Structures are given as C-alpha cells and as structure tokens.
Amino acid sequence: MNGMWALLRLASPQLPIGGYSYSQGLELAIERGLVCDPPTARRWLEDQLLLNLARFEAPLLLAQCRAAADGDWTALEALAERHRASRETRELHLESRQMGFSLRQLLEDLPELDEPSRAVFARLVEPGLAPAWALAARAWGIAPEDALAAWLWSWLENQLAVLMKSLPLGQQAAQRLTSALLPALGQAQRTACAHAPDDWGTVAFGLTLASMAHERQYSRLFRS
C-alpha cells in the first residue's frame, strides 16, 4: 500500500472505530463552564496535549508501534497491559476497549494483517486502542513515528468535533483553533519521541475528575 494513502487511512475520521462517540471529559468541562469559548478550548486542548498526551499516552503508543514494527511481541504485550492498567476511570477503560475491539474486527477482516499479528490479538486479554493502532500501523507499513502523528491528529480532530457539537463552535472557528494548536501538536510529538520509558508519567487530575463526573452527567451526547 502507498505509504501516504495508508497514513491518511489510519488518521481518517472514517476509520470505523467509534471515536466520534467519546469526548474524554471535554463534554463535562463544557457543561461546567470550564470550556466556554475558543480561548478556553485552546487552553484545555493545549494542556491535554502537552501535559498529558505528550508525557505518557503518546510515548506509550509510540513504544507499542515500534514493538509491533520490530515483531517484538513480548514487549508489545507488556506495553499493552501497561496501557490497560493506566485507564483511571470506567469510561476511559471502556473507551479504549471498545475502540480497540472495533479496530481489531476491522483488521482481522483484511488480508494485510499477518499471522503473527493475528496471534497477538488472540493472546491479548483485552486489546485496547493503542496496541490495535500499533498492529494497524504494522499491517499498513506505516512507520512508528508517522503512526504517532496520525494518532495525535485523530485525537485533535475528535476533540474539535466535540466542540463543534457541544460548545457549539462553528466550522471556521474550529479551523482557526486548529491553526492555533498545530505548534502544540508538533511539540507533543517531539516530546513523546524524546521521552525515555523511565520518564513516562503524568498526573492529569483534571481529566480524571472530569471523566468520573461525566459518568453521572444528567444530559450528554458522548460516552466519555
């Protein structure tokens, strides 16, 4: 498969894994007034990118992509378990599990998924989104660093979709916000690539509390 087409395919919002169903606490932040306009939305997303994703989620995903690309299945399975254990709330756990299951179903129906990858899927107790993303990158010949970029872009697009539905935020305003967030997106990728495993970690109290409160939110559009 052409590398560019494969990368666009992985990053596409049309990838049938249900990402549009989740806000990762953003809907609760909107409901509580923490995010109420483009400037507060920018601060929320920048903090998520630079203080949370770049320091733990992104380097952990990158490590899984590298393990899958190298065929280091022992490392991939250990990293997948670490990712599963790091889901701090019920909603975040269910989000990763559902999206991972959907991506697994998609991949297992495609000829590009090789036998070693199929065997890994069979061994994983609960394949979350991160290991499934890594195996998708392997199947489609996507370099680990590019797979990370696709994941970060997919995350940002989904968060912007939440804002457009819930804030609400117009399409033009969403594009201006995208332009404003591109430097943070690039910084998150660079930080993740430079982070050694001993440095992985984040304390995202706000995200965790928002996710917990969202479980009891009276009226909501999203599952997290």
UniProtKB/Swiss-Prot annotation:
Its main location: cytoplasm. InterPro entries: UreF, UreF_sf. The keyword Lipid biosynthesis does not apply. It is found in: Cytoplasm. Belongs to the UreF family. UreD, UreF and UreG form a complex that acts as a GTP-hydrolysis-dependent molecular chaperone, activating the urease apoprotein by helping to assemble the nickel containing metallocenter of UreC. The UreE protein probably delivers the nickel. HAMAP family: UreF. This is Urease accessory protein UreF. It comes from Azotobacter vinelandii (strain DJ / ATCC BAA-1303).
